[in-house]
Amino acid sequence: MSTCQQVARPLVRCLRQTGPGAATCSTRSVAVAAVRPFSSTPMRKEEGATTTTTTSPVDSTTTPPPLPSATEAKATVADTVVGGPELGSRRRRAALATTGNLPFEQLPYQCFQDARKILQQDRAAKIAQIVKETEKIKLIEARDASEFEGGEAAKQTRIKSLRKYIEELKILADINDPEVKRRFEDGRGDMTKPVYRFMAERRWRSMDYKIIAQRISQFHVVPDLLPAFDPTMDVKLSFRGYQVSPGAILDSRVTEVAPTLRMQVFDKGERLLTVVVIDSDVPDVTHDNFKRRCHFLAANIPWDPSKTVLSLRSVGDRVEGDVGKPWLPPFAQKGSPYHRLNVFVLEQKPGAKIDGEALKKHLENRENFSLKGFREKFDLEPVGFNLFRSEWDEGTAEVMERHGIPGAEVEFKRQKFASLKPPRKARGWEAKRQKPKYKSLWKYVKRIA
């Protein structure tokens, strides 16, 4: 028998089956694919309808389960893509698709279950070590500072070192747990726990941090605004619900409304933040230079790892904080180069609250704002950054008129300077033949005035 006949014979058999209870090839293949590995029992959803157990999944006497209807399949896909919790890795979703309604931690894979046992043993060892280190801290706290060689400073340094080691053990205890990874991939991680903060920071530094660091160097934020700066928190920018990539040029009608910041800190505890938005490219015609303008400033904003969204429009109203300068829409006059709008997040010293009246007094004028001087006066530490750019567009004049900003009719042009070189004598074949003796050739020669 030829190879073609061997391949075609099963297809012909499938086509000849015309009975109402006969299974087609496609249905039988689905039934074979739906069989759970490492088990000969039916799936949970089929236990009510199935009364016998079959050892061979391809037995011709067994009627395969019916295919789901188009409506059910469409609902399942929509559940997964739009609102369902299964947003993690494709490998995990593929494993869940072949195991029915089993819980994630009970997947019937021998290797998976053996790995979970090893991870549980390792976690128990880490927890025992955490208890041991906690007892050490209690003993050190009970001792007098005079017993340490460096006094109270050495005692606090030792306690701080042990607490840092305990935080590392907490991360190592759960970093490989499949359930922890699943929650983090699905966006349901508890940021009050160190393991989720560690995973979030690792993901941020893998790409988003590199992009922000590149923009800081590419747009010369350092040293134009600060002598040195390395961000340590994630800050994302969105206008009217749409996230903006760092450094994007936005329409002035979009930036007319104050943005929303998605901020994520990676260390525990509550702190007070200050948000500053600066235009670092305001033309200064008098001095033929550029100056800076403050477009927004708010201080004393409480923040912790569990918070993620800050609407600048809500500061001082629904969100606690003191507004030094409300939002001023970014604008650029016609002919000027693009303006860099820098969004800085600065952390205040623990327990140090900025006086609102002193803040407003320091910012009586938006122009000539110095971030370096503001930072030194109020003892702030820059921790987060993002930026966008603004140019003159068809809606800039309307935005400036609505908010009472003068200068919409101003247009910047490059100033032309007369050359300081003396006039150059004409040279070339035509220049030599401008004399009267070449008058017969003038009709062929270009006249040079």
UniProtKB/Swiss-Prot annotation:
Q: Which UniProt keywords apply?
A: Mitochondrion
Q: Indicate yes or no for the key word Manganese.
A: no
Q: Which SUPFAM superfamilies match?
A: PEBP-like
Task: Please name the InterPro entries in this protein's record.
Answer: PEBP, PEBP-like_sf, PEBP_euk
> Coiled coil located at which positions?
none
Q: What is its main location?
A: mitochondrion
Q: Which subcellular locations apply to this protein? A: Mitochondrion
Q: What are the start and end residues of every segment in region (Disordered)?
A: 37-72
Q: Return the Low complexity bias intervals.
A: 50-62
Query: Can you list the GO cellular component terms from the UniProt entry?
Result: mitochondrion
Record has Mitochondrion as a keyword:
yes
Q: Which family does the similarity line name?
A: Belongs to the phosphatidylethanolamine-binding protein family. Mitochondrion-specific ribosomal protein mL38 subfamily.
Q: What PANTHER family does this protein's entry cite?
A: PHOSPHATIDYLETHANOLAMINE-BINDING PROTEIN, PHOSPHATIDYLETHANOLAMINE-BINDING PROTEIN 4
> What role does this protein play?
Component of the mitochondrial ribosome (mitoribosome), a dedicated translation machinery responsible for the synthesis of mitochondrial genome-encoded proteins, including at least some of the essential transmembrane subunits of the mitochondrial respiratory chain. The mitoribosomes are attached to the mitochondrial inner membrane and translation products are cotranslationally integrated into the membrane.
Q: How does it assemble?
A: Component of the mitochondrial large ribosomal subunit (mt-LSU). Mature N.crassa 74S mitochondrial ribosomes consist of a small (37S) and a large (54S) subunit. The 37S small subunit contains a 16S ribosomal RNA (16S mt-rRNA) and 32 different proteins. The 54S large subunit contains a 23S rRNA (23S mt-rRNA) and 42 different proteins.
Q: Spell out the protein name for this chain.
A: Large ribosomal subunit protein mL38
**Organism, as annotated:** Neurospora crassa (strain ATCC 24698 / 74-OR23-1A / CBS 708.71 / DSM 1257 / FGSC 987)
Q: Which gene encodes it?
A: mrpl35
